[in-house]
């Protein structure tokens, strides 16, 4: 029965190991119902994750229903777990020595885990200490390994101890395997978390790279649009600059014309002011002259009054001095003539004074009209000058802006011009090299033309010499034929090899020229047919001598 109970307990232990629970406190494992006294007792327990263990924690054997932790039978210090820093359950075990255990009996005990603060963190199932029965001390075993039919009789305690050690060893192996699997699971979970984090980071990076790529594409499109817009704006600005330059030139012309008009107006004003001064001076002179004439008129009036007084006195005297009338008649005539003259002078002076007053009034009216007209024109010119100054200021501001823009465009244009200048210098250098090469080829061409002309001259001299030699041979043959008129005229063959012997210098020159040949059409001689001879005379000529070099197309003067 005890063996069956032990097997059942072992099955329960394996089930507990295969299906662990995660209690909030300390859990005790492999607690038997009965422990044999005078043998050490091994206690297995688990510490859950999150519980802080200490070397001051202890495990005691208490009687069931004992309330105080001081009523323990025996205790041992708890062993701190080896994997306390890991996120898993810690498995530990302690041993109670045999001589500290309670005596056997029916009293039930259990294990308690007490921390350093005196709090009970876990209790085990109840168990008892009892002696084994005498009938059950021996166990019969069959020897399955040996071939003999033998029965082994061993003590039950030894058998149970061996079974317990085997179970403990198997349990330890299973616990190690479980811990290894748990560690592997934890490492795999960490690896999975790390890979998930790396995947999230890579996805975020990929998403950010896609956004950056799209942003770069949009920026590129925007930059292309801005570049096209800037090109359009640059073209518009160039047109605007040209238009503004033309407007500035026209405004400069207008300003020059306005300056000339202003200068003319200032000159007119100055001349009018001078004329005004002259008129004032003339007016003063006229006033002085009028006053002088007035004084003269007054003096003449006084003279007339005195003359009238004198006339009245003279009449009185005439009445009184009738006697002296005859003597004074001459004096009276003179006085009358003087009076007449004075009256005429007075009338002339009055006419002059009236003319001068009329002229003065006309001059003053004309001067006032001219002054008002000049004032109006000066005010209009002032307004025009103010407007022109404001317009000039605005044009100066716009011109300054256009100059700044033009300066920026000029900088760009200078850069492009520098690049084009560099390219132009390279093109010029290449052109100079091509020109030098062309000059060299032209010089070579001229040399070839000169050599060709020399060859043509030499060929012409050879043709003339051959013609002379042919004429001489023909004359000699003719003379021979005349001497042999009676005989039948065979076909004469005249060998001109002697001509080669006669001109060794020409042969040397032909050797210097190399393989040369004359055109047969140019050197062929049409010999005349004699009417007295029934057959033709054939003259054997030497091989044609001419330059075999064909003329190059570039040497042809028609192809130049």
From Swiss-Prot:
The keyword Transmembrane helix does not apply. GO terms for cellular component: cytoplasm; nucleus. Pfam families: CALCOCO1, SKICH. Residues 487-496 have a biased composition (Low complexity). Residues 480-517 are annotated as: Disordered. GO terms for biological process: positive regulation of transcription by RNA polymerase II. Its main location: cytoplasm. It comes from the Eukaryota. It is found in: Cytoplasm; Nucleus. The keyword DNA-binding does not apply. This is Calcium-binding and coiled-coil domain-containing protein 1-A. The lineage of its organism: Eukaryota, Metazoa, Chordata, Craniata, Vertebrata.
């Amino acid at each position: 029965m005890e063996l069956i109970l032990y097997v059942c307990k072992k099955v329960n232990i394996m089930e507990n190991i295969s299906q662990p629970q995660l209690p909030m406190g300390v859990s005790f494992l492999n607690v038997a119902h009965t422990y044999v006294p005078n043998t050490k007792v091994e206690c297995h327990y688990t510490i859950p994750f999150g519980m802080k263990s200490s070397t001051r924690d202890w495990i005691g054997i208490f009687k069931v229903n004992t309330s105080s932790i001081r009523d323990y039978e025996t205790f041992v210090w708890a062993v701190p777990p080896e994997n306390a820093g890991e996120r898993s359950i810690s498995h530990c075990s302690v041993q109670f020595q045999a001589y500290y255990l309670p005596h056997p009996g029916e009293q039930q005990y259990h294990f308690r885990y007490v921390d350093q603060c005196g709090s009970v963190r876990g209790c085990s199932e109840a168990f008892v200490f009892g002696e084994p029965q005498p009938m059950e001390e021996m166990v019969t075993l069959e020897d399955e390994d040996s071939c003999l039919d033998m029965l082994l009789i061993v003590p039950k305690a030894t058998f149970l101890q061996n079974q317990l050690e085997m179970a403990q060893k198997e349990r330890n192996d299973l616990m190690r395997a479980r811990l290894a699997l748990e560690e592997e699971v934890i490492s795999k979970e960490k690896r999975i978390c790390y890979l998930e984090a790396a995947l999230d980071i890579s996805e975020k990076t990929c998403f950010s790279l896609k956004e950056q790529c799209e942003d770069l594409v949009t920026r590129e499109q925007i930059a292309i649009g801005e570049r096209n817009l800037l090109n359009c704006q640059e073209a518009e600005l160039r047109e605007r600059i040209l238009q503004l330059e033309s407007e500035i030139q026209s405004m400069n012309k207008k300003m020059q014309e306005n300056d000339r008009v202003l200068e003319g107006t200032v000159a007119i004003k100055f001349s009018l002011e001078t004329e005004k001064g002259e008129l004032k001076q003339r007016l003063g002179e006229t006033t002085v002259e009028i006053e002088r004439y007035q004084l003269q008129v007054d003096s003449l009036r006084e003279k007339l009054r005195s003359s009238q007084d004198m006339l009245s006195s003279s009449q009185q005297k005439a009445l009184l001095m009738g006697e002296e009338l005859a003597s004074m008649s001459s004096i009276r005539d003179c006085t009358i003539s003087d009076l007449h003259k004075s009256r005429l002078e007075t009338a002339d002076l009055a006419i002059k004074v009236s003319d001068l007053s009329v002229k003065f009034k006309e001059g003053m009216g004309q001067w006032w009209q001219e002054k008002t007209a000049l004032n109006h024109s000066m005010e209009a010119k002032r307004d025009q000058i103010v407007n022109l100054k404001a317009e000039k200021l605005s044009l100066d501001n716009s011109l300054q802006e256009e100059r700044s823009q033009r300066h920026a465009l000029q900088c760009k244009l200078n850069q492009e011009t520098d690049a084009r200048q560099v390219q132009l210098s390279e093109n010029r250098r290449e052109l100079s090299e091509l020109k030098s090469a062309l000059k060299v080829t032209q010089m070579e061409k001229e040399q070839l033309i000169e050599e060709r002309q020399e060859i043509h001259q030499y060929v012409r001299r050879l043709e003339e010499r051959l013609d002379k030699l042919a004429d001489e041979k023909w004359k000699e043959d003719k003379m021979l034929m005349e001497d042999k008129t009676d005989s039948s005229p065979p076909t004469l063959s005249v060998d001109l090899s002697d001509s080669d012997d006669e001109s060794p210098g020409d042969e040397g020159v032909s050797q210097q020229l190399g393989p040369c040949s004359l055109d047969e059409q140019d050197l062929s001689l049409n010999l005349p047919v004699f009417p007295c001879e029934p057959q033709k005379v054939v003259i054997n000529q030497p091989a044609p001598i001419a330059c075999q070099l064909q003329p190059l197309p570039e040497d042809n003067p028609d192809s130049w």
